[in-house]
Amino acid sequence: MHLSLGFLSLIALAVIAQDTSIATVKRAFSNANVWIPLIYIPEDISINFNPTALLEVTFPEPGARPITIHAGQQLPRNSTAGPPSFSVRGAASRGPFVVAAVDPDAPTPQDPTSAEIRHFLGGNFVSDGSGLLHNGTAAVSEFLQPTPPAGSDAHRYIFLLFNQPRGFNDQTLVTPTTSISNFDIATFAKAVGLGNPIAGTFMLVAPDS
């Protein structure tokens, strides 16, 4: 199904609201599934998404206020250069956590033969008193700015937060030199013992006009 950018923008505007509760995030995912099947998340990444905390993803904006995305919000590509910062609210512990970001729509939502693209993978995140996550080690995969190709519909970019298991720093399935294409977050999570994500959010980014 081909969806115009204008239609996607209208739906994205409908879900721009303060993510004040887990129910708000789950409702955004659910509403996206009802109205735009292309935006449904858990089925496309084969992972059980039943969050118990809130993940906030904030992009710096030179000369302007940072943008904290709300589940389902569409951002201009030039607002996603990043790297973003992460915060968590409602988590049972202060970490450590693993953060992952994937694009299940590459090269296009209708023909995602390169999906998933791994846009970020990092561990050893711990929360300070305000919930802001800090990381003292290099990411496994540094943040890659969304770059959907010309002519594509908007892509979904999904951010997931996991509790970090012991031994995660010793995993070798994904390294800084591993291809970012055809990544499978569900398979990776199972292989390294991440379990299911405890929080998540997503945004839409369309090609530059």
Explain the meaning of each model-derived region.
Residues 2-17:
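Cleavable N-terminal signal peptides of Sec/SRP-targeted secreted and luminal proteins
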Residues 13-209:
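N-terminus-centered regions that define maturation/targeting leaders and the start
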